């Protein structure tokens, strides 16, 4: 079997005086983790939580099979002025064994051109393209579907569905 892991990342910060700001006045403190003394992280460093977790799982015996970029066409706005707005997360495909079930046909993507015939340089006719579609790529463009009255960060159901179908 497989495990599909999605963990959000955060930025390093420091605990301490917030200048009297509270609640929603703490701009930029969302997705922030406190830096411990002696850490090699600096304030405002991207921590890399997904990769730290993936490498720790690999050290624990898991096979790190693939990193998939979940590209978000409509990400949550960020009020940052010193870096681009984050519009992706990582999904890691892991397995406990080198041989595992993976159903590539279940998540194939449509072909740009229909399956057809082509003539090669020797005049032989070849069938081009898999009629089931092309193999899934490692960048998945999946947007959440808005739900009235719901939380702003709606998790798209198509994301776990694709993982479940594949493995």
Summary of predicted features, one role per range:
Residues 1-167:
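Core catalytic lobe of class I
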């Amino acid at each position: 079997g497989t495990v599909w892991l999605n963990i959000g990342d955060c930025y390093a910060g420091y605990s301490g005086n917030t200048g009297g700001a509270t609640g929603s006045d703490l701009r930029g403190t969302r997705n922030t983790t406190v830096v411990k003394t002696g850490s090699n992280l600096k304030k405002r460093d991207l921590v890399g939580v997904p990769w730290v977790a993936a490498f720790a799982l690999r050290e624990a015996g898991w096979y790190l099979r693939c990193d998939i970029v979940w590209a978000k066409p409509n990400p949550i706005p960020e009020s940052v002025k010193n870096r681009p707005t984050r519009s992706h997360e990582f999904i890691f495909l892991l397995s406990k064994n080198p041989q595992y079930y993976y159903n590539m046909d279940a998540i194939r993507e449509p072909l740009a051109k229909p399956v057809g015939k082509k003539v090669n340089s020797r005049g032989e006719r070849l069938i081009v393209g898999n009629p089931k579609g092309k193999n899934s790529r490692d960048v998945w463009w999946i947007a959440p579907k808005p739900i009235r009255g719901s939380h702003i960060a709606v998790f798209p159901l198509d994301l776990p569905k694709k993982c479940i179908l594949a493995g």
